[in-house]
Amino acid sequence: MTIRALLLMSSTLLFGTAVMAADDAALVAGVFNPPRLAPDFSLRGSDGAELKLSRYRGKVVLLAFGYSSCEAVCPITLGVLAQARKNLDAAAGQLQVIYITVDPDRDDAVRMRTFLGGFDPSFIGGSGTPPQLAAVRTDYGISVSDKIPVPGGGYALNHSSFIYLIDRSGKLRALMPYGHGPDDFVHDVRILLKQ
């Protein structure tokens, strides 16, 4: 390899790194620096297939955790994500929302499909055994409270409510806390889609 070829390759690599760093700085969400590979998992998907994160390489993934009986934070989050996906217009097909339950006692694949379908039929839910779900929560730093009794019977759960932004190569790129609107997700997803 000639010196000229080496210099060209080095400058291209440096330029690409600089562009990615500049794009990361423009993200609204908190950035993972450096990005790291998102832990894969194997759960029951609400679409009837095995749910593996690696199945969605080539798409940007928004990974969230919650449960179908949640009455406040979860439906608001899913409404925001549905609006963001809609606002992506033609790029919507390059985004996958994955929503993993924190309530294995009540959320099976059928219930997750019905619940998520009310927001966007493209959303995929993940359910599984308590040990399977606990392992995924540990990998992603998701905490869940013990069951909190509610008037009239039943229970509620408190849980971490941030959303992971995973790029097309399967790397954790950013973490969006609860409370951001659709425009912030659209902004960050468009940046990740350019890379």
Give names to the regions the model predicted:
Residues A38-P39, V61, S160-F162:
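Short loop/turn microsegments at loop-to-beta-strand junctions
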Residues F41-V61, R85:
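A short beta-strand-turn-helix
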Residues Q132-D188:
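Thiol/disulfide oxidoreductase modules built on the thioredoxin-like
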